[in-house]
Curated annotation (Swiss-Prot):
CDD domains: Anticodon_Ia_Arg, ArgRS_core
Protein name in UniProt: Arginine--tRNA ligase 1
Reaction catalyzed: tRNA(Arg) + L-arginine + ATP = L-arginyl-tRNA(Arg) + AMP + diphosphate
Domain of life the protein comes from: Bacteria
Protein's GO biological process: arginyl-tRNA aminoacylation
Motif ('HIGH' region): 122-132
GO cellular component, one term: cytoplasm
Lineage summary: Bacteria, Bacillati, Bacillota, Bacilli, Bacillales
InterPro entries attached to this UniProt entry: Arg-tRNA-ligase (IPR001278), Arg-tRNA-synth_N (IPR005148), Arg-tRNA-synth_N_sf (IPR036695), ArgRS_core (IPR035684), DALR_anticod-bd (IPR008909), Rossmann-like_a/b/a_fold (IPR014729), tRNAsynth_Ia_anticodon-bd (IPR009080)
Pfam families per the UniProt record, alphabetical: Arg_tRNA_synt_N, DALR_1, tRNA-synt_1d
Subunit structure comment from the entry: Monomer.
Keywords for the protein's UniProt record, in alphabetical order: Aminoacyl-tRNA synthetase, ATP-binding, Cytoplasm, Ligase, Nucleotide-binding, Protein biosynthesis
Subcellular location(s) per record: Cytoplasm
The enzyme's E.C. designation: 6.1.1.19
Amino acid sequence: MDYKTQFAESLSNIFTNELTQKQILDLIETPKQDEFGDAAFPCFSLAKQYKKSPAIIAKEVAEKLSDPFFTKVEAVGPYVNVFFNRDTVSDAVLKTILAEKEEYGQNHFGCEKTVVIDYSSPNIAKPFSMGHLRSTMIGNSLKHIAEKCGYEVVGINYIGDWGTQFGKLITAYKKWGNEAVVKEDPIRELFKLYVQFHEEIKDDEELEEEGRAWFKKLEEGDEEAVELWNWFRHESLKEFSRIYELLGVEFTNFQGEAFYNNLMEDFIGILEEHDLLEESEGALVVNLEEEGMPPCLIRKSDGATIYATRDLTAALYRQNTFGFDKALYVVGPEQSLHFNQFFTVLKKLGYTWVDGMEHVPFGFILKDGKKMSTRKGRVILLEEVLEEAIELAKQNIEEKNPNLKQKEEVAKQVGAGAVIFHDLKNERMHNIEFSLENMLKFEGETGPYVQYTHARACSILRKESVEFETCTFTLKDDYSWNIVKLLNKFPEVIEAACNKNEPSVISKYVLDVAQSFNKYYGNVRILDENAEKDSRLALVYAVTVVLKEGLRLLGVEAPEEM
């Protein structure tokens, strides 16, 4: 039951011609102070129609509004404020959560629709750095949120597995590589070779030509070049899979850039058919001057295609294969122009489905105010950060609860969860200041704080067993009421997170629920034997359901003991 909908329904019986129930619902606000009620309806938009001041309209509406659902209705200036019957609402909300369990919050507006989400997309033979964390975790969370809203979700890891860098890497491996050494630590060793190539090229310009020659061989299907490329790709994907497992991230497919090699000429043919290609200094481009953008480069003067061609080809392939209604590209803000050009070219081709495509950018991870990329002159590996976080979580557990069962498993859940939650707790366009020490604290706005609150609630339920099926729940105190109101908001929070492509909406929400529950825990004697005990335990159970599901939508696990 949504009490705002109930309020909107009651108001729509008064405003039969002036406003629809949906318009009323959109206008309803939640007062910042409890003394102004549980919901408020502003009357400003009706002043012109009624030819009366909003305050007079509010007074007249308050007099007409009667519903057993409300214990009090009052006009305060231009607002109609209502106080809900706490017994009725708490009983309805708790019964809904107890019945639906982890299904609670499910929306259906995405039913029979498909969304493709392109996220993570690391480059083969390069380390999985902290820079990849944001795209990976934002995309993973958006995938869970879209599924919760009824969408069929296709999660694509558009691996960077093609390009001239592979000619350079093959050259470096042929000159300085050792198969046994590479097999021991593939990504680190291949990256070392790639870096060595760029060091050596300063004194040996012929290396550039050798790199080009090997890439040409690769494009032409040379057996040795293809065999090495396949090996580099296979070893890299094995490494990436280990990190994805640690983060709990899954994809529908790993169709990378190379997958589209044989499809690009067909797409270039479509551009030619629509007379969109122009020659510019020997290259082929789509002119976007009318749209106020530089031309979109399709084929370089040496005949090579670039990533715009690949992305355009991939978009058409994905539409033909999955018939998507929405396509999200979770990629850094530096690619904004590329996506504007890419979407505009598709529009010029007359594809209406481009309206469902969206670039979902995000801020940077900073260390001491600077973009985080190197530590002692090298790339900061995400795996190292996760291992460090898990180790610190283990130390925290040893200090706080040395007898905890499954310490290793819980340390993984807390360590990885801390890194993920820290990434998702702020609006995605905000830059993030990285601090392992802060993100692992058990108090404040952290993942471990929410996880610990969930574990605390679970520990209360282990002490008592209640059959909730036959109960009627009555909760009147302010601490309980604040939680009930928050729990009731969960479905609309999920919908807002989905519509805004914004996981932080859920992060902030679970923090609010955790803080509200901890106030309740500190002020209410939950296990006291009296008439409200079953209702209080039902509330605790409902909190565990919503916290666990909220964390799951973020890609964070919720241990039952910590």
